[in-house]
Amino acid sequence: MRRPRRPGGLGGSGGLRLLLCLLLLSSRPGGCSAVSAHGCLFDRRLCSHLEVCIQDGLFGQCQVGVGQARPLLQVTSPVLQRLQGVLRQLMSQGLSWHDDLTQYVISQEMERIPRLRPPEPRPRDRSGLAPKRPGPAGELLLQDIPTGSAPAAQHRLPQPPVGKGGAGASSSLSPLQAELLPPLLEHLLLPPQPPHPSLSYEPALLQPYLFHQFGSRDGSRVSEGSPGMVSVGPLPKAEAPALFSRTASKGIFGDHPGHSYGDLPGPSPAQLFQDSGLLYLAQELPAPSRARVPRLPEQGSSSRAEDSPEGYEKEGLGDRGEKPASPAVQPDAALQRLAAVLAGYGVELRQLTPEQLSTLLTLLQLLPKGAGRNPGGVVNVGADIKKTMEGPVEGRDTAELPARTSPMPGHPTASPTSSEVQQVPSPVSSEPPKAARPPVTPVLLEKKSPLGQSQPTVAGQPSARPAAEEYGYIVTDQKPLSLAAGVKLLEILAEHVHMSSGSFINISVVGPALTFRIRHNEQNLSLADVTQQAGLVKSELEAQTGLQILQTGVGQREEAAAVLPQTAHSTSPMRSVLLTLVALAGVAGLLVALAVALCVRQHARQQDKERLAALGPEGAHGDTTFEYQDLCRQHMATKSLFNRAEGPPEPSRVSSVSSQFSDAAQASPSSHSSTPSWCEEPAQANMDISTGHMILAYMEDHLRNRDRLAKEWQALCAYQAEPNTCATAQGEGNIKKNRHPDFLPYDHARIKLKVESSPSRSDYINASPIIEHDPRMPAYIATQGPLSHTIADFWQMVWESGCTVIVMLTPLVEDGVKQCDRYWPDEGASLYHVYEVNLVSEHIWCEDFLVRSFYLKNVQTQETRTLTQFHFLSWPAEGTPASTRPLLDFRRKVNKCYRGRSCPIIVHCSDGAGRTGTYILIDMVLNRMAKGVKEIDIAATLEHVRDQRPGLVRSKDQFEFALTAVAEEVNAILKALPQ
């Protein structure tokens, strides 16, 4: 069987096909074409237009005509298991029903299955159709025993033997017979049911566990509602096997050896049922309820005709030689009774053909009196079955459980649609369907009341209320309980009670409860027995399944569901308390989270306010501020006109790269004022290209040679300035004015304040002048961040030195540590000793730095000046900026604003050493390069500035950062030069 699949998917080459045809010729007359195709129930295209699909009990077989009787297959569980294996191999090879190899293998397997010959049809006289009284009906029933095989493929079983005598048998119907006869009438009067759900190869024939899942003893019944099936064809109808299976036949006709069922002449009740069923199916009744039943096109009637046993079409009433009696010949009482029965089904007498009317009258005489008039009795199951047919059709789309358990065909009274009603509640009728298991021998039938109490009822007598089904239930602690866990629990329970797992039917799960019913079993165990045993072996079941069994019992399904709220209600107080506590905890947690979020937001706002205070357009202050600004502008305008009359001042000896290569040496209005310029374009430098490339190559080599850089830094650390005394800074009155005790100004290089103007009557401030080349004019003033008690000294230094630019390289607070005190007003104006500082504007240039403008006024002399503060924010205390680009842009802004006036630039950080020294070193080197100096020695320049203030450029990283910044600025200048 394991052959390579050819591209066409037909399973072999032409040579193999010819060889198989020769093998068929050697074994069968007629060659390959004479072999009937198997599998037409799954693929209708196998049969030609001259052939029909005949039910053979398994797959269906194509045959020309339907008159030829075919042997019946005795299908058992081992046979199905073997066929499953064969089909698996065929499907694994990619073969289909159309392949010759598949047909050959299936035909060989079919030859191995045992066969049963159907009885030869005998001529029947008209007496078999004549209506008889209820008394002799039993006599007719025992005389006319021969029956055809059941129309369902799953029950090709030997027909039961008949009693010894025909006319001498029992003359009255037993209670069991009286209860089993109404389904015959039900099958005739109710409209044809829709085709069964489609079947797939995988679940139907390729799953060995279906026998255990659905409990079919002969392994021939598959689920009618299994989910996930692939449609390959309709199933045969299963109404007749439920009525004429081996158990039902023995119950009705008895088990009497000695006579074959084909020995007695005349029509049997089974034959009447089949013939009348064919007549009814041949002509659809225009009943109102027929429109509710969906039918597939071209399958509603053809499937029933094809699924019925062979020969029934030709063995109808027409073959008996005589026409049935007309309605006029029938007794009036019988017609009235038949009309009353038909009225309950929505059918009128005039809608029936004479053949149908005669057959129904014959069957009606077999019914006990009052059976058709009592819609709620035990015997009359027509109303319940009708509800089961209408319920699932109308409510199928509203509620459908994931898995459904089909009723077993061997059960005598199981309705084909009862499982659907049990699993899918119908919105039309909430009354449970009737599928009760009747006892075989007793005359009294048990009728279940809605309260679960048993009430004995004589068969055939009307009852006051309809019967209700009983279910066994097992309540567990798992909610919801999965269907797989429930089935596993029942399998283990079946082992403990020595039953087959197939004895459990109508299995369903309702929350944590498992409900089920049991079919007739060899142990004769009832639902009460099984649930009682489940309670006895509770510990074993819990150990094997891992579930905790809370309760077991027997009752209606509503009772099993009613147990659930009681269990929940017992724990509801504790659960409500727990839920209340959880809710309170959640609300409290939410409130705490909101409070924390508000605090964090407020703290962030406060930090932003400290960092970027008084944001807004220029002049966004009070009325006093506006008046003061107008006064300052008028004063500055007057001073500007006076300076223009005197002539331009001398150019400064200290200039930046940007100021050196600007368009023109524009004079500032005052030597103590600055004119802000926000041009971002890099200045065009007149640097020699060869010199610039030489300097750039030197700097890059300097940075790549790590050993050289390390040795150079070690030499800088060992350098000692001479002289290096700091006695004044360490004096008793001045030591409190130092922010850091290790970074103090030298005695020979420090800024001295005027004592008469100082509030502390001291000339000391922690600040050092940094001279570039002219000792009389320092280019920078390096100082620490002002303390709260040295702010007045700081503004005195700004006023006396004539500074117009302040470079601040530290935030006020960093990592919770104060780096510098705010020495300018938060908004408006503030007075520090005799110096009034007015914040004019604050402009956030980018995320790395911002610019502030101030008016500085000496209240003693009433003089005013303008100055600009450049505040760089992205330089950590012990490290370096992430990139040199922001600092170089910041430096360009500072030099654009400075305009080269004859005043130093005040540079400060926190301690006035690390960041301050790095900025001064970068700016000084670049200024020298802009002046045309071709020899650049950064280490020597650093030693030069350290001679004037100790500790400038505190770390090796800061020194390397200065080298990198210089190299990048040189590269930028070279790119800006014209090529």
Swiss-Prot record:
What does the entry's free-text domain comment contain?
The RESP18 homology domain is sufficient for targeting proICA512 to secretory granules.
What is the official name of this protein in its record?
Receptor-type tyrosine-protein phosphatase-like N
Q: Which disease is it linked to?
A: Autoantigen in insulin-dependent diabetes mellitus (IDDM).
Q: Name one GO molecular function term.
A: spectrin binding
- Quote the annotated effect of residue 524 to A: Reduces N-glycosylation
Pfam families reported for this sequence: Receptor_IA-2, RESP18, Y_phosphatase
Q: Where is this cross-link: Glycyl lysine isopeptide (Lys-Gly) (interchain with G-Cter in SUMO)?
A: 754
Annotated membrane topology: Single-pass type I membrane protein
Question: Lumenal side: which ranges?
Answer: 35-575
Membership in a protein family? Belongs to the protein-tyrosine phosphatase family. Receptor class 8 subfamily.
Q: Which residues lie on this side of the membrane: Cytoplasmic?
A: 601-979
The signal sequence is 1-34
Q: Name one GO biological process term.
A: positive regulation of type B pancreatic cell proliferation
Modification note: N-glycosylated. O-glycosylated with core 1 or possibly core 8 glycans.
Residue ranges, annotated region (Sufficient for dimerization of proICA512): 449-575, 601-732
Q: Where in the cell is it found?
A: Membrane; Cytoplasmic vesicle, Secretory vesicle membrane; Perikaryon; Cell projection, Axon
Site keyed Cleavage: positions: 448-449
**Residues that bear Phosphoserine:** 308
GO CC, sorted alphabetically, is: axon terminus; endosome; Golgi apparatus; neuronal cell body; nucleus; perikaryon; plasma membrane; secretory granule
Q: Which residues form the Tyrosine-protein phosphatase domain?
A: 709-969
> What domain of life does the UniProt record list for this protein's source?
Eukaryota
* Disulfide bond annotation, renumbered to this chain: 53-62
Q: Where is this region: Disordered?
A: 112-173, 289-329, 393-439, 643-680
